[in-house]
From Swiss-Prot:
<protein>
    <recommendedName>
        <fullName>Clavanin-E</fullName>
    </recommendedName>
</protein>
<dbReference type="Pfam" id="PF05452">
    <property type="entry name" value="Clavanin"/>
</dbReference>
<feature type="propeptide">
    <location>
        <begin position="20"/>
        <end position="29"/>
    </location>
</feature>
<comment type="function">
    <text>Has antimicrobial activity.</text>
</comment>
<feature type="modified residue" description="Phenylalanine amide">
    <location>
        <position position="52"/>
    </location>
</feature>
<feature type="propeptide">
    <location>
        <begin position="54"/>
        <end position="80"/>
    </location>
</feature>
<keyword id="KW-0964">Secreted</keyword>
<feature type="signal peptide">
    <location>
        <begin position="1"/>
        <end position="19"/>
    </location>
</feature>
<keyword id="KW-0732">Signal</keyword>
<dbReference type="GO" id="GO:0005576">
    <property type="term" value="C:extracellular region"/>
</dbReference>
<keyword id="KW-0929">Antimicrobial</keyword>
<keyword id="KW-0027">Amidation</keyword>
<dbReference type="InterPro" id="IPR008453">
    <property type="entry name" value="Clavanin"/>
</dbReference>
<keyword id="KW-0044">Antibiotic</keyword>
<dbReference type="GO" id="GO:0042742">
    <property type="term" value="P:defense response to bacterium"/>
</dbReference>
Length: 80
């Protein structure tokens, strides 16, 4: 009787451990997916702010010029 209970207990723990491992892999997949979504949303918001001029300082770097600097460029245009 004790042996039967012990065997059933061990089998039950094995099933729970397998279930736990399956849940861990599903959670890891979910966290990776959420990380990718957050990353892409951040990229979208950053690009959106450049296009619509929320930060003029960054726009100057993005487009390669500042109007108030009389055409000074952040990169070599070859005509200087």
């Amino acid at each position: 009787m004790k042996t039967t209970i012990l065997i059933l207990l061990i089998l039950g723990l094995g099933i729970n451990a397998k279930s736990l491992e399956e849940r861990k892999s599903e959670e890891e997949k979910l966290f990776k997916l959420l990380g990718k979504i957050i990353h892409h949303v951040g990229n979208f918001v950053h690009g959106f702010s450049h296009v619509f001029g929320d930060d003029q300082q960054d726009n100057g770097k993005f487009y390669g010029y500042y109007a108030e600097d009389n055409g000074k460029h952040w990169y070599d245009t070859g005509d200087q």
